[in-house]
Amino acid sequence: MFPGRSTFFIFYDQNRPANGSSFGRAGAKRLRGQGRGQKGYLMINGVIFDMDGLMFDTERMWATFWEPALAALGLPYKKGLSEAARGTAGETLRNVVRQFYGQDCNAAAIVDSLHAVADKAFQKPVPKKPGLDELLAWLDEQHIPMAVASSSRMDVIQRNLDNWGMRHYFSVLASGQQVTRSKPDPEIFRLAAEKLGVTPGHALVLEDSYNGVRAGAAGGFVTVMVPDLLPADAEMRRLYTAECRSLFEVLDGLKAKRW
């Protein structure tokens, strides 16, 4: 427990799942293992948010940035690139680019061109995901510390938060620039948890992407998936703790302590 902080408990009842949410095998096993009988309890004292596709409707925007970024370098867009690159940053992202354009391509120049296109688009407020305001306000009222852990650059994270006046909710901002291994490696979530002063087993990670869920699960976090562009597949259902259709459902689940 931390002075000045609140804690909430998540429980799992295998006979009564939360409306609109579902449990993955890993989540159900973890919760049952910590509870009594058919119910398990998890003490959550910190929440870590992904940004693109979870807080803001920006994954669709990123998908449109690749074509002009590549065209500026005289290169064609190759099908599947944006999906493979989703949720990655740094050398991981450059390696994805090399997979599509060859090991000898100038991956750094391609990524720089991508960020140049994104910088222009992100000067104005980007669309928020439904339920974000309500979830942040409730967590703030409960004195639950929050972090953003995003593969995006720090200036992009700060700009998106500042454009909506919500940076004050977060005591920690973790950027892909601060880690050497991007998602699906859990390094960025571990960094955020360390700065929040919470352990992975007591930190809730909210993610929309496959790589993000992989990272949360690999790091031992309580990982809730809120799918954006891609629905949860069999792998995700094995990895995540639970799935919700929106941030409103995340909030409902926390209030009801159903998961």
Sequence positions of predicted segments:
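Asp-based, Mg2+/Mn2+-dependent phosphohydrolase catalytic module
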Residues: 10, 41-45, 137-140, 154-259
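Glycine-biased, low-complexity coil/linker segments
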Residues: 24-25, 32
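Short, Lys/Arg-enriched N-terminal segments with co-localized hydrophobic residues
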Residues: 30-42
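N-terminal helical cap/lid subdomain that shapes the substrate entry/recognition surface
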Residues: 41-142
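Residue-level detector of anion-binding/catalytic polar loops
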Residues: 76, 145, 222
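Conserved phosphate-coupling serine/threonine residues in phosphotransfer and NTP-handling enzymes
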Residues: 150-152
